[in-house]
Amino acid sequence: MGKIKIGINGFGRIGRLVARVALQSEDVELVAVNDPFITTDYMTYMFKYDTVHGQWKHSDIALKDSKTLLFGEKPVTVFGIRNPEEIPWGEAGAEYVVESTGVFTDKDKAAAHLKGGAKKVVISAPSKDAPMFVVGVNEDKYTSDVNIVSNASCTTNCLAPLAKVIHDNFGIIEGLMTTVHAITATQKTVDGPSAKDWRGGRAASFNIIPSSTGAAKAVGKVLPELNGKLTGMSFRVPTVDVSVVDLTVRIEKGASYEEIKKAIKAASEGPLKGIMGYVEEDLVSTDFTGDSRSSIFDAKAGIALNDHFIKLVSWYDNEWGYSNRVVDLIRHMFKTQ
């Protein structure tokens, strides 16, 4: 089997980190990047220096010309095209396109990439109509005739594996999720206008900001047996990366907190290895920066009121973990061909 050739549309936080994951993978080849809003030389700077994940040190990065980046000896074609259907992915050899602009998140808009020669599109955000897949949870439902998929959200990727383990072992009656979530690019540095979400317009680094999230309801899309049983909300907090899910659920089959811990530990060492983590150390958020797993269960942080009512805590690097799953989903699609 040859390498999996990918292109990235939108060189923002997720786009750049997916590029980092791809460039460190033996089986994946980054062949093209499209972003109409930044020049190629600025692209090299933004890729090389990262406040959260540190400087890129795996290969030299240089400008070959205005349309080509060099990662070591590896050339990557650069486009600056606004309209997705005009991006010549086929010419660049990109078969799988990561749609990470945050703009083209529905099937019709994402399908524009197919016109330029892409074979499959992975949307790095939730989608209202593209099928959503969470690696470790429902990627086995993917069939090769599906050309446009969503990798759901970073929070759904954290919550769904945890919810799956609990539901498979103990049965979830109902639950509420809160994610304590790091700042993201859409927030404001100082108080500013945000017509749809007034609180969201307040200064990100000075406030704890309650916000809505569809992440818990989306679990019902990837695990239909939990449809209508979970909902949740978010607090945006003044940290720059790493978030944490608090899942409070009622369970059918009574179990002690120790038994619940055992079930999660077994999953983290077995079927969900590399997706679900398990820690018993006294860790804090920065300890999870750069963790490639989707969901790291904090055994010491959770509590049980009784054998049927429990609160579970699970960490995630909402940037790096998620970007790794985007590439994992592409790998799975490639194998399914």
UniProtKB/Swiss-Prot annotation:
Enzyme Commission (EC) number: 1.2.1.12
Subcellular compartments: Cytoplasm
Single Gene Ontology BP annotation: glucose metabolic process
Pfam families linked to this entry: Gp_dh_C, Gp_dh_N
Pathway given in the UniProt record: Carbohydrate degradation; glycolysis; pyruvate from D-glyceraldehyde 3-phosphate: step 1/5
Positions of D-glyceraldehyde 3-phosphate binding: S153, C154, T155, T184, T213, G214, R236
Tissue specificity field: Developing seeds, seedling roots and shoots, and embryo.
Catalytic class of the enzyme: oxidoreductase
Catalytic activity: D-glyceraldehyde 3-phosphate + phosphate + NAD(+) = (2R)-3-phospho-glyceroyl phosphate + NADH + H(+)
GO cellular component term, pick one: protein-containing complex
Residue span of region Binding to NAD: 1-151
SUPFAM superfamilies: Glyceraldehyde-3-phosphate dehydrogenase-like, C-terminal domain, NAD(P)-binding Rossmann-fold domains
Annotated site residue numbers, Activates thiol group during catalysis: H181
Keywords: Cytoplasm, Glycolysis, NAD, Oxidoreductase
Subunit note: Homotetramer.
The family this protein is said to belong to: Belongs to the glyceraldehyde-3-phosphate dehydrogenase family.
Function: Key enzyme in glycolysis that catalyzes the first step of the pathway by converting D-glyceraldehyde 3-phosphate (G3P) into 3-phospho-D-glyceroyl phosphate. Essential for the maintenance of cellular ATP levels and carbohydrate metabolism.
Protein name from the UniProt record: Glyceraldehyde-3-phosphate dehydrogenase 2, cytosolic
Encoding gene, per UniProt annotation: GAPC2
